[in-house]
Regions:
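N-terminal secretory signal peptides and thylakoid transit peptides that target proteins
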Residues: 1-16
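N-terminal Sec signal peptide cleavage junction
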Residues: 23-24
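Mid-to-C-terminal functional-domain signal that highlights helix-capping/loop sites
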Residues: 29-359
Length: 359
């Protein structure tokens, strides 16, 4: 079967104004930032990188569209669950709850935009999605916004912030040099968890959820994902090789098998999502620290916790029983949680070749 390039996939939607593809030169569209003087909020500690920041710039490739050729949603609007008739029960959504307010971001909309600059409980945030690596991550953005650079590294979206025009590879969540800011401070973004689940699962748990509207200000056919489909799984998402060669290849698992990955300054760890689903609980090691991975059947997702004392926990009918006999929701164990997210195996292994993997 002929592999479809990212440019071809996106160009296939040109008839509905999907993406204006331009000639990609590395300096195109640069300009020293928006003049706001805003600072992107940074994490307390830097996350690990697979190579030197300058080497990551050298490894970056054009994804097809130029800077902002895939337009972020900068003025999102939301509707109620009863108005979201365009979503089928099995369609993926990316969910978050803050201060009692639930929001769902449909994957079929994010596939066309990759970034939504939004607010949660008054806090400015960016919801980011990379279709090629199957990753969704949330970041605090401070007084600026994030945009799509048009470049990829390890097939992963490289974002840029509009205040300083620094490059930020999504999975790494750490600044690297780019054509518009050659010497950024190397620091990591402040993250928050988004849950990759289905519309039905999210709606059942959060009937009052707000849903990102298709009224984005951009002419798009949101019924069509240029890469394939998740409901049922088809096209790029169904399997096969990534569009571009990954930084490193690891054939222990199929390239697009999904892992629940967690990384911290001390290292990275991954749990096969289907293995975690079957087991309910899995133990592993993040650097020198024992960790516990927990499956949450409510959303078919997973959480990873530091468990330095290796306390005994047990999955019991959708909850987790602790050593004292008390039960906890899978997302609320009395342990320190490590930021965890879904990722395609090739992308995780390419960025974190020394990762421990458990199934």
């Amino acid at each position: 079967m002929t592999r479809l390039t990212r440019r071809q996939a996106l160009a296939s939607l040109a008839s509905v104004g999907a993406v204006a593809l331009a000639g990609c030169t590395e300096g195109a569209g640069g300009g020293g930032g928006d003049g706001s003087g805003a600072t992107v909020p940074a994490a307390d500690a830097r996350l690990p990188l697979p190579m030197e920041p300058a080497e990551l710039r050298e490894a970056a490739v054009s994804g097809g569209p130029d800077k902002d050729g895939i337009p972020s949603i900068d003025d999102p609007s939301f509707i109620g669950a009863s108005e979201a008739g365009f979503l089928a029960d099995g369609d993926p959504v990316f969910g978050v709850v803050r201060d009692g307010v639930a929001k769902a971001y449909p994957q079929k909309i994010l596939a066309h935009h990759e970034i939504v600059n939004d607010e949660l409980a008054g806090d400015p945030v960016s919801v980011t999605y990379c279709p090629l690596t199957g990753t969704v991550l949330g970041f605090d953005r401070g007084g600026t916004t994030f945009g799509v650079s048009g470049r990829l590294v390890n097939d992963n979206l490289i974002m840029y912030d509009r205040a300083t025009e620094t490059w930020w590879p999504q999975i790494l969540a750490t600044a690297v040099p780019g054509p518009w800011n050659a010497e950024p401070e190397v620091r990591s973004l402040r993250e928050f968890r988004l849950v990759w689940t289905t519309w039905k699962r999210w709606r059942d748990q959060h009937p009052d959820t707000r849903v990102l509207s298709r009224d984005t200000g951009h002419p798009r056919n949101y019924a069509r994902d240029p890469y394939g489909d998740y409901n049922p799984r088809d096209g790029y998402y169904a399997g096969g090789a990534p569009l571009f060669p990954p930084l490193r290849e690891d054939d222990r698992y199929g390239p697009k098998r999904v892992v629940m990955g967690a990384r911290a300054p001390e290292g990275a760890v991954a749990f096969l999502k289907d293995g975690l689903r079957d087991a309910g609980l899995l133990t592993g090691q993040l650097g020198d620290v024992p960790v516990l991975a927990v499956h949450d059947p409510r959303h078919d997702t997973g959480y990873v916790y530091r468990n330095p004392d290796e306390a005994a926990y047990e999955a019991v009918e959708g909850e987790v029983q602790g050593p004292s006999g008390t039960t906890h929701a899978p997302n609320a164990l009395p342990l320190e949680r490590v930021h965890t997210f879904d990722a395609m195996w090739f992308a995780w292994a390419g960025f974190y070749p020394e990762t421990n993997v458990y199934e």
